[in-house]
Amino acid sequence: MNIGVNFFGPKRSLYHDFDGTLERLKQSGLTSAEICVAFAGNGEPPKELNLQIPEEIIRQMSGGIWPLEVASERLAAVRTHGLTVLSCHMMLGFQTTPEQLIGMLPTLLEFGTANQIAYYVFSPMKDLNGIKALIPAIKKVSDGLAEAGITLLLHNHEMECIPVDGVTALDYVLEQCPNLGLELDVGWAKFAGADPVALMQKYHDRIPLLHFKDVRADACAANRDTCFTAIGEGSIPLRGIMAAAKDCAIVEHGLIIDQDDSPTDILEDLARGAENIRAAAQ
């Protein structure tokens, strides 16, 4: 079973020892990577999350979130280490406007075609009211990428899974944008109080990539940035998720661990998480 990793999680390790970290990931049985590229914005977190990130940590984040000007070179290095790369997480500014999103399309097309990117992933981090203004831009970008054979995927956080007047941003945007796929993050869905298995069943034909994240049973807004566990050691229904994955349109190398952080050693967590995913699939 091929299992990958999103580079946001091991960002500090990649910052301190890029090549050594890639080798450790391979030795852990991970076979692919989802890169994160800063296409726009200053990288500052939204104020409503109330995160306090020291400057040194922001510098270390560059290990996993690459500036566009060095992304192609680093991507080539990742592939040289034998890791498959199909997808790129677009790291946008949290206040990205519809006009700015549309304006990125030529750059996305250029980078994607030059680097054999099959999927772009973006995280709006908006509820229903916030997502509505972005719909025309999402349509235009997803349609433009589709013409080049690249699929745009929505990656959810908890905001997209919390209903507003009975409707979630996730449901609304997928209904409005037929060329948009879904990279469901099961951990953020669980954090929001949603049922990740039910979401997988509902959108089974629109999920080519699946993000594994696990959170403690007491995960809440107060501990949002420290609630992560190795996959299979928190509160997500991992066996149910793996059973539902069989009926989804998940591609080879489409199972991706996206553990944001670790209270101990992120690389050890990733290794255990991969083992737990494989065990849950049996």
Predicted regions and their residues:
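Active-site beta-loop-alpha junctions enriched in small/polar residues
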Residues: 6-10, 36-40, 90-93, 124-127, ...
